Amino acid sequence: MSRLRPYRAGDAWLVSLRSEQAGDRMSFYDTAEGPAMTFERQGVVIACAGLARVWEGRYLAWALFSDLAPREWVRVRQAMHRVIGDTAGRIEATAAFPAAERFLEGLGFEKEGVMRSYHNGRDHALYAQVKS
């Protein structure tokens, strides 16, 4: 059984990332302002997700998933719906693999375009949702 808890500094480094996300960890996860959560299964961190405030009214949604996490994606998506539902303004996210795009679309994000050679030389799709 998995459990949801508030994100703590360092949690992002405990996720054994899916192969598609290898190299995606960035230090900003621990210093970002905004709501974030961690998912554990049997005491092992399997996913982290949250919003990072860029400036007033603009946020960056982020998520890190382990190879075990797809079974938990529905639960992560439900938790992110609650976080996003309380946030007004523009929320952006990027996706570098199809499962991430499906995850964002399930959250109501719309694809705005493709950013070529965006991170680690890979193309990323830019997604956003805007709420007032």
What are these language model-derived features?
Residues 1-27:
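Short amphipathic alpha-helix that is part of the acyltransferase structural core
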Residues 26-29, 62-63, 75-82:
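Acidic/histidine-enriched, beta-strand-rich ligand/metal-binding domains
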Residues 32-33, 49-57, 112-116:
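A conserved beta-strand-loop-helix scaffold within acyl/acetyltransferase catalytic domains
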Residues 38, 43-53, 59-60:
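Conserved beta-strand in the GNAT
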Residues 55-68, 125:
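Conserved acetyl-CoA binding element of GNAT-fold acetyltransferases
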Residues 61, 118-132:
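C-terminal "cap" of GNAT-fold acetyltransferases
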Residues 70-86, 102, 106:
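Conserved acetyl-CoA-binding loop-helix of GNAT-fold acetyltransferases
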Residues 87, 91-105, 110, 118-119:
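Conserved beta-strand-loop-alpha-helix junction that forms the acyl-donor binding cleft
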